UniProtKB/Swiss-Prot annotation:
Natural source organism: Ampulex compressa (Emerald cockroach wasp)
Descriptive protein name: Ampulexin 3
Keywords, sorted A to Z: Secreted, Signal
Tissue note: Expressed in venom sac and, to a lesser extent, in venom gland. Not expressed in brain.
Signal peptide range: 1-17
Subcellular location: Secreted
Amino acid sequence: MKAIMVLFYVMTLTIIGSFSMLLQKAKERQ
């Protein structure tokens, strides 16, 4: 069960990281 929680946590961090990178790129264009 713990392995699933860790995997979910890592996936969430990855999604948040890539999302923030996209936001920063959009800001640079403006």
